[in-house]
């Protein structure tokens, strides 16, 4: 979502996301991924229209805080449930929290929902340093928690704010080595 969304009506926001999605379909993208959303009511009509137009896979990912709520007050459980019960092809959570809090949230949710689940936490929590938001480098701790997240059943794992190509490379290496074993 864009910061200017706050000044638009629901119908205006839906209309803009439909235009963006249709443009992506017309360009021939393989997947349309709406990420870091605090609510699903904006996306549901967008997804319906896009799926009726072409069968481009659509992923939706929500941003929640360490308590499991979006900045619009929706719980992670409610957001994921709404998306699972729609035409969305893949659901998930990204941003908002570091890997520890993401893992704690996922332990309270049933992510075995019949659709692929994507989980991409931030590298941690940024600190304001010299007029910039900076994330501490903690790849080992991040990878350790990502392994636990994958073991809970996440189908797609990665990183959001504060991660970089080296984090993703280390996730890939961890998967290749077989360090990730899904829970039974």
Go through the PLM ranges and name each one.
Residues 1-184:
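Domain-level signal for soluble alpha/beta catalytic cores
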């Amino acid at each position: 979502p864009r910061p200017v969304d706050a000044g638009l009506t629901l119908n205006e926001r839906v209309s803009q996301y439909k235009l963006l999605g249709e443009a992506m379909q017309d360009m021939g993208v393989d997947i349309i991924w709406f990420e870091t959303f605090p609510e699903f009511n904006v996306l549901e009509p967008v997804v319906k229209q896009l799926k009726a137009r072409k069968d481009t896979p659509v992923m939706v990912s929500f941003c929640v805080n360490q308590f499991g709520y979006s900045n619009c007050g929706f719980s992670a459980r409610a957001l994921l449930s709404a998306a699972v019960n729609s035409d969305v092809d893949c659901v998930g959570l990204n941003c908002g929290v570091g890997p520890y809090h993401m893992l704690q949230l996922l332990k309270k949710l049933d992510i075995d929902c019949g659709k692929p689940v994507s989980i991409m936490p931030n590298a941690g929590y940024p600190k304001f340093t010299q007029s910039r938001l900076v994330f501490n480098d903690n790849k080992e701790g991040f990878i350790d928690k990502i392994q636990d997240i994958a073991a809970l059943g996440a189908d797609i794992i990665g990183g959001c704010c504060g991660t970089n190509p080296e984090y993703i490379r280390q996730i890939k290496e961890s998967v290749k080595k077989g360090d990730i074993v899904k829970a039974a």
